[in-house]
């Protein structure tokens, strides 16, 4: 059985382990930009208690096998731009043994509902350019590239 729910403090250790797997994956894709280690558990707890952030956890067979860290933001207003409140996905991770299309879809469905309940305008996220599997997944879920980030060593 699969369920998606908001994380609690009891989930901190499992979220810590998922962040480790996610950051190890990112490190394999872009070793110059990511360390292959987890995040501080205090940071996870701060996100759980935040009023503008939430963790979603994906449980399969009673075990947490995926997570998403999301936040509610407002875009900056510069002359000529339209101001929006939107949902930003900071981290999105489904364990590699699971089918991303099936389980990721359910996790994203819960995220969309969270955004609609808060009357947010759109979903935004940054994904590594060479994480083809996730890019393909988000494209299937109707997320479109609207900007690109360019980076070079100074």
Where are these regions (language model features)?
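Conserved GNAT acetyl-CoA-binding A-motif
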Residues: 115-127
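Conserved beta-strand in the GNAT
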Residues: 57, 63-72
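Conserved GNAT-fold acetyl-CoA-binding loop/helix
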Residues: 24-44
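A short helix-loop-beta-strand connector motif used in the catalytic cores of GNAT acetyltransferases and
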Residues: 45-57
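Conserved acetyl-CoA-binding loop-helix of GNAT-fold acetyltransferases
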Residues: 91, 100-113, 140
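A short beta-loop-alpha structural element at the N-terminal edge
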Residues: 3-17
